Swiss-Prot record:
It is found in: Nucleus. Residues 364-389 form a coiled coil. The lineage of its organism: Eukaryota, Viridiplantae, Streptophyta, Embryophyta, Tracheophyta. GO terms for biological process: regulation of DNA-templated transcription. Residues 1-20, 34-70, 182-245, 362-401 are annotated as: Disordered. This is Transcription factor TCP8. The keyword Nucleus applies. GO terms for molecular function: DNA-binding transcription factor activity; RNA polymerase II cis-regulatory region sequence-specific DNA binding; transcription cis-regulatory region binding. It comes from Arabidopsis thaliana (Mouse-ear cress). Pfam families: TCP.
Length: 401
């Protein structure tokens, strides 16, 4: 084999090798190679990155919490809502709306002072009340506070947050005409225990308040009002005891009578006697007759008995008065407790006026009885005078014989 043949064989092998390599390059370009990240995953990654970017921005809605109100839902800051939740647990309320109602009742004086209007209790549907607080704090009075509502103890409380609790100002409100003792409420507030607080660096919602029983407060308020009413009744002026004296029958005064004051000694005796009668458990007779002296026939009144009002059982010296047997009615036997009803006179005098009215309402019957009694007395006196004349005549005749 010569040298030319060897060269031809080498060229053929090179051509084959070259051709095979070219086919491999073509096949490699035409082959499909899978990619490491599909296009869908890249799109999801892009959207997730934008979502994380948007979550970093907090909207204003996240800072508010919905709390159930009275018939509707209201919005308030989260710190206020947290405080409302805590108060609901501490006060034992059934819902947060009840706690909000309690807070509005406590703030009623401040609402009236700020708006100039308000109802007692507050009308939540029409009253424009915004539970927004400056400085993200909600000031509330302590649980053991002065009773609720102005005329029923309506007071205004101011709680000092910076001082740690303990400064309260009670101002009574004369909205409905009730008069309360301001000094008594102030002393009561000053004697109350201060509110326990956590140091200022911690959350406001962790302040602790004592639980309150509103029913006990209402009972205490009613007892205090009853005591004040009793004190005002007992401190009122008492009516002086008076005697009703009828005029002589022939004086022409008609049914006129006089009211004479009882002397001091007689008044003391009357009080002691009335106390004894009350203690003994029996009532004195409503009418006491006082008979005039027997020797007063020439005075014209005769020995007629005059009836006086008597709440006691002692004899009153009235011999110098000659009265007609005018029945003045059944007066009060025992002095009734004085109850002022806003009139210029106590009610103890009203019983006397009622008795006089009933006496005069009988009209002609009382006058007829009085005239009959007067006629009987005059007839008796005439008989006595005639008997006396007959006796004197007989004596004169006997002496002449």
């Amino acid at each position: 084999m010569d040298l030319s043949d060897i060269r031809n064989n080498n060229n053929d092998t090179a051509a084959v090798a070259t051709g095979g390599g070219a086919r491999q390059l073509v096949d490699a370009s035409l082959s499909i190679v899978p990619r490491s990240t599909p296009p869908e995953d890249s799109t999801l990654a892009t959207t997730s990155s934008t979502a994380t970017a948007t979550t970093t921005k907090r909207s204003t809605k996240d800072r508010h919490t919905k709390v159930d109100g009275r018939g509707r839902r209201i919005r308030m800051p989260a710190l206020c809502a947290a405080r409302v939740f805590q108060l609901t647990r501490e006060l034992g309320h059934k819902s947060d709306g009840e706690t909000i109602e309690w807070l509005l009742q406590q703030a009623e004086p401040a609402i009236v002072a700020a708006t100039g209007t308000g109802t007692i209790p507050a009308n939540f549907s029409t009253l424009s009340v915004s539970l927004r607080s400056s400085g993200s704090t909600l000031s509330a009075p302590p649980s053991k506070s002065v009773p609720l509502y102005g005329a029923l103890g309506l007071t205004h409380h101011q709680y000092d947050e910076q001082g740690g609790g303990g400064v309260f100002a009670a101002h009574t409100s004369p909205l409905l005409g009730f008069h309360h003792q301001l000094q008594h409420h102030q002393n009561q507030n000053q004697n109350q225990d201060p509110v326990e607080t956590i140091p200022e660096g911690e959350n406001f919602s962790r302040k602790r308040y004592r639980s309150v029983d509103l029913s006990k407060e209402n009972d205490d308020r009613k007892q205090n009002e009853n005591k004040s009413l009793k004190e005002s009744e007992t401190s009122g002026p008492t009516a002086a005891p008076m005697w009703a004296v009828a005029p002589p029958s022939r004086s022409g005064a008609g049914n006129t009578f006089w009211m004479l004051p009882v002397p001091t000694t007689a008044g003391n005796q009357m009080e002691s006697s009335s106390n004894n009668n009350t203690a003994a458990g029996h009532r004195a007779p409503p009418m006491w007759p006082f008979v005039n002296s027997a020797g007063g026939g020439a005075g014209g009144g005769g020995g007629a008995a005059t009836h006086f009002m008597a709440g006691t059982g002692f004899s009153f010296p009235m011999d110098q008065y000659r009265g007609s047997p005018l029945q003045l009615g059944s007066f009060l036997a025992q002095p009734q407790p004085t109850q002022n009803l806003g009139l210029s006179m106590p009610d103890s005098n009203l019983g006397m006026l009622a008795a006089l009215n009933s006496a005069y309402s009988r009209g002609g019957n009382a006058n007829a009885n009085a005239e009959q009694a007067n006629n009987a007395v005059e007839h008796q006196e005439k008989q006595q005078q005639s008997d006396h004349d007959d006796d004197s005549r007989e004596e004169n005749s006997n002496s002449s014989e």
